[in-house]
Amino acid sequence: GVLPDEKQVKIGVTYMTMNNDFYKTLNAELEKKTNQQGSRLYVRDPELDEGKQSQQIDFFVREKVDVIVINPVKSNSPSIISSLQKAKKAGIKIIVVDAPISQDVKVDTTIVSDNYQAGVLIAQDMMKRLPSANILLLEHRNAVSAMDRIQGFIDTIEKQPSYKIISQKETLGQTEETMPQVKGALDEGLDFNVVMALNDRAAIGALAAIKNQGLDKKISIYGVDGSPDIKNFLATTSDIEGTVAQSPIQMGRKVAQVIELMQEGKSYDSQYLIPVHLVNRDNISQYTVTGWQ
């Protein structure tokens, strides 16, 4: 608990969206740990709107929070960057989670999954399973984390002419945005046998769209996150080829740990990379399918 003479630490938190269990889980872990530390959390949801997120940061500055934890709606958004610069001037510490922010603002630390490696792992698994592939990429172009995954994938297949990217669609990493995009690709007659989705939400949207078409050919679908939904598909069906597990729990824990170091005036790193792991039908039995890792 908080000693009477200690100032309660105030933490402003804004994730790009709460319409994703990854952020809900990360936040639940952060709440649990910071409650134990006696801190006060202000959590806001910008709903993928950069203007809204920038206003939320301005609100945190007015509230005189000690720390801002941000997962940016858009990594190079001028309005978000300008609000963060105001926060820095006010002496507020800034922790960026899950997707880095552009270099224009000096943040205190960035805590992200090894997103590039996630793309590499998927490409390697696909090449092991398939002698050739026509690939549909599902993207979220504003999110650096998502584009790093796509880049890792592209770089890994680059020198292999039998693996071709035939189309790239913007999905915002949301299931409901993905379904019409993939349906459109199928309606156009695009011939693909692999879907590389930036996250599990997009992978599930792709699966729904493909199932609705009742295709007789096999399309291999990959996601990234290791969400309970996808792990359940991996454990019980052959609909999904694989995902790369991130750990929102570990990420939330690391954020809380760094906040504690900041409060104690101890040193901490400017970047923490959280390792990622390929999950497929061969190793799904080693994972819990009910929750996150």
Predicted regions and their residues:
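Short, solvent-exposed amphipathic alpha-helices that sit
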Residues: 22-37, 118-122, 145-163, 177, ...
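Short beta-strand elements at the ligand-binding edges of bilobed clamshell
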Residues: 43-45, 102-125, 137-140, 236-249
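Hinge/cleft segment of the Venus flytrap/periplasmic-binding protein
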Residues: 156-157, 247-293
